Structures are given as C-alpha cells and as structure tokens.
Amino acid sequence: MFGLKVKDAQKDDQKSSEYLSGEAGSQAGGSTQGTSTTTQRRGSSNENKVKVLQVAMKKKSDSEDNGQIELETNNLANAPIKRGSNNNQQVQLKADDFGTTSSSESGQSGTQGSTPSNPGPWTPWLTTEQIHNDPAKFAASILILYDAPYARNRTAIDRVDHLDPKVMTANYPPSWRTPKWNHHGLWDWKARDVLLQTTGFFNPRRHPEWFDGGQTVADNEKTGFDVDNSENTKQGFQKEADSDKSAPIALPFEAYFANIGNLTWFGQALLVFGICLS
C-alpha cells in the first residue's frame, strides 16, 4: 500500500539528453552543460545560499556504448578545501587544524585560552628527542608464543627482536619525528605507538627459518590457492612431489602480521613494554 511502485524500465526515444529545469543549460554538439548556479534555502537571506558545483556531461553517439551519457568535466576536486598549492589540489595542514577541545586539556598542553569553538594550535606532547633521552623507558621487547608442530611439546616461545626507539625513528622524515600522523595514516595518541611505526618489522621474510622448504617455491611460483577450484579453497604451499596431497602450513603468528601500528595483543603474540631481554 505504501512505498514505491516499481515498473519496468522503458526508454523514451524523444529524450536523447536531459538537464535539470531551472538551470541555464546550453546544448550544442551533442553535449549538455550545467552552469554554476545558486540555490536558496529557508528564505532569501544571503547566508542561506548554497553554491551548486559545475558538472558537464556529454552524450556519446549511438554507435558508442549505445549512446550512454558520460561525465566530461567537473570541479568537485576543487571543493571544499582550497588551501594548498598546485592549483588547490594539494592540501597542506597547518597547526591550527589540530588543537585541544577543552580548557583543562589546554592547560596541560601549554595552550592557554582554548575553547571547543576556538581550539588552540596542536603541539606534540612527546617529541622524538624525549624518547631518545630515556630509551629504557620507552623501549620494548616482543615475546611470541605460537604453535610449533615440529617441536616436542608443540609450543615455542621466542624473543623476536628488541624495539629501539632511536633506531626506529632514525630514518623518519622530520614531519614524522613527533607523535603526529605516522605513515600508516594513524593518529598517535600514545607515545608508545611511535615504537611500532616500522616498515617491514613483522616481515616474515626476515626469518626464513620459520617456514618450511615449500615457502621459497611458493613465494616465487605458486599462489597457495587451487586456481582450478571454483571455491578457491586454500590448499597450502606444497612441494611438487606432494602436489596430490593437502599440506596446509602451520605458521607462527608473526607471519600473519602486516605493517601495522597500535598493536598490543594480536593472536598469541604479546608485546612487552619496558623489558629488555638482551
């Protein structure tokens, strides 16, 4: 009773191109141009006017894709942020874009007079130099507890590596040397997250002894999936001699890590902060 009444789609041969009524449109050479106009909302006051973005479309000939309409040009890329360089296509954030949202936080960060409506400029509360001055406080070690099917008790525990904050941030560009935006696109609210801003730290290729002999072949020749199976089920990496048998791989949990930050617990991997197991 209520709702949309759906009918079969029908083509109207008399309407080869359309544009919104009320807009100043020009139709020439098989193209339709919708110019930039303004629309008023809730009265006639100037502050309620909304600018309409310009979009140009053209209709292909009947021999091209059944005469479909394609987008020719638009100016959506120029809106809504216009600060920057290179024809306003590159946005450059300033310190004023980030700030405290309450007066209590502003007193701690050294920004006086900040309000939710007028936040003060953002300043890092922990710099890389402060981390370097006290490496024992911010250093971390990683302990891994994983299933080892070839071990006697099927369990292995190992220390993978030690996170040295000075080494981790040594090759960072200057804009990454504070707990701000890291190169994973994550915001570092905690200082210890800086320790996990590494590229390739959890890369299983750094420890080839974790894998069996079939891993080398799989990295270069096989995908690990049965491409002939419509369900694309995982078959595991196998040697040529055992290709007729199912041989799923049991990997330590480090192998499933990517270049991820902000991790404290993942699977059965435990990150222990403030402990040096050298």
Swiss-Prot record:
Pfam family, one: P1_N
Region (Disordered): 1-86, 98-126
Biased composition (Basic and acidic residues): 1-16
Low complexity: compositionally biased ranges: 33-45, 99-117
Top-level taxonomic group: Bacteria
Family: Belongs to the adhesin P1 family.
Name of protein: Uncharacterized protein MPN_412
